[in-house]
């Protein structure tokens, strides 16, 4: 569990904010009626606000530890998990339906006419990609030593205003869900 070790690097404020958010999410699971939830959320916020200006870090750390223990004992046994979140029922469900970018090249002109702004911008990206391809490959060949490591990250742009090599897959994404 690598995410647990990152807690040592969080500031006190970040730990308090994360505890507050977790407490609100679990409170949402306990109180299904919105008005009741809002009332208890205001009470919870008031409890956190009581000690928000605490200057003594020893006391603040002790308060945080006590609050985390209270949260642990009062958490919901089956908290609500959003469907698209990790652990949710629909998490990564539509991965197999994502359409690759090259499939848009095969659209009929009448289909492309329905989204003129998108396809105009896409054509600009494709033109820029064609123009920069040779220069980017040349830059990579010059900067990569023969027999050198092939798993390192790509080098950054060397000139002001230039893009790093092979950049377009970062700035252009395929449609995430089919229509």
Swiss-Prot record:
It is found in: Mitochondrion inner membrane. InterPro entries: Complex1_LYR_dom, Complex1_LYR_NDUFB9_LYRM3, NDUFB9. One of its GO terms (cellular component) is mitochondrial inner membrane. One of its GO terms (biological process) is mitochondrial electron transport, NADH to ubiquinone. The keyword Electron transport applies. It comes from the Eukaryota. Residues 139-160 are annotated as: Disordered. The modification Phosphoserine is found at residue 85. The modification N-acetylalanine is found at residue 2. It is a peripheral membrane protein. Keywords: Acetylation, Electron transport, Membrane, Mitochondrion, Mitochondrion inner membrane, Phosphoprotein, Respiratory chain, Transport. Mammalian complex I is composed of 45 different subunits. Accessory subunit of the mitochondrial membrane respiratory chain NADH dehydrogenase (Complex I), that is believed to be not involved in catalysis. Complex I functions in the transfer of electrons from NADH to the respiratory chain. The immediate electron acceptor for the enzyme is believed to be ubiquinone. Belongs to the complex I LYR family. This is NADH dehydrogenase [ubiquinone] 1 beta subcomplex subunit 9. The lineage of its organism: Eukaryota, Metazoa, Chordata, Craniata, Vertebrata.
């Amino acid at each position: 569990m690598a995410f647990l070790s990152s807690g040592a690097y969080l500031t006190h404020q970040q730990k308090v904010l994360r505890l507050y958010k977790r407490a609100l999410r679990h409170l949402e699971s306990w109180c299904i009626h919105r008005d009741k939830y809002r009332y208890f959320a205001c009470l919870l916020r008031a409890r956190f606000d009581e000690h928000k200006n605490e200057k003594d870090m020893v006391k603040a750390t002790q308060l945080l530890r006590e609050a985390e223990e209270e949260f642990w004992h009062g958490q919901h046994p089956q908290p609500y998990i959003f469907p698209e979140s990790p652990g949710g029922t629909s998490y990564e469900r539509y991965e197999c339906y994502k359409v690759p970018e090259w499939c848009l090249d095969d659209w009929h002109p009448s289909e492309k006419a329905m989204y003129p702004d998108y396809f105009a911008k896409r054509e600009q990206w494709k033109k820029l990609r064609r123009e920069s391809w040779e220069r980017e490959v040349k830059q990579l060949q010059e900067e990569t030593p023969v027999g050198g490591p092939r798993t390192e990250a790509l080098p950054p742009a060397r000139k002001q205003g230039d893009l790093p090599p092979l950049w377009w897959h970062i700035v252009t994404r395929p449609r995430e869900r089919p229509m």
